[in-house]
């Protein structure tokens, strides 16, 4: 009807997360944000740096979850280098609600989940927010580059804009954090960790659907996860890595199985975080196995090789 305010109906593309939101804006109403924008006020977020003093004082660095098996193996590498990294839980349904509270629901699901993980942890009361930093990987070309801005915006909205957000990237993003440096030695150990993670994940998913004794594959997997973490805590050598890989394969080969290879194999592909994160994919591997199939998930190393090949 002429002269009436227009109603903007915003339909979410996130299935069953939130209802459609209705917003109305009357003619002539100018928000404070629009006034600032028109006056040329900068909306850039402050960039608190993570300093060497913060590292030496043992500040907690929160790292959001993506690939539980792999990231769990990366933590000992950071701790060995003097960083007090705390990896967030792999299954956390409250993270989605927290993300929707602080991130516009038009943003993609991975961005909501990652921001939600961090905000839920920051506001949990478990950590001293005056001695807290956040670590987030940055790639480029999509929302993965926007994570850091989304997190800073969310922190600022609850009065915690002083928390440093560290961008972990091999590209020049204009971020300066003198207290956080990834050394060639750390990178070398990380390659071992990711290869261990890929191997253990593939061995587990290949054997668990056929195990004779329920839980035996998980127990063997956890044994080798603990062993690999101990190695990474003191530093892995190439000869030790080769021996460990052979022993892992031999142990899983010796696991009592029934009907190996007879079940349909179901591949899991797609966006990197959703593919690996149990909460993001609604425990898709467990669902596949409960339905009498075998899940096949490509390794995380393949993702990085794909990126390298693409230049």
Residue ranges and their predicted role:
Residues 1-311:
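An N-terminal assembly and electron-transfer interface module characteristic of large anaerobic redox
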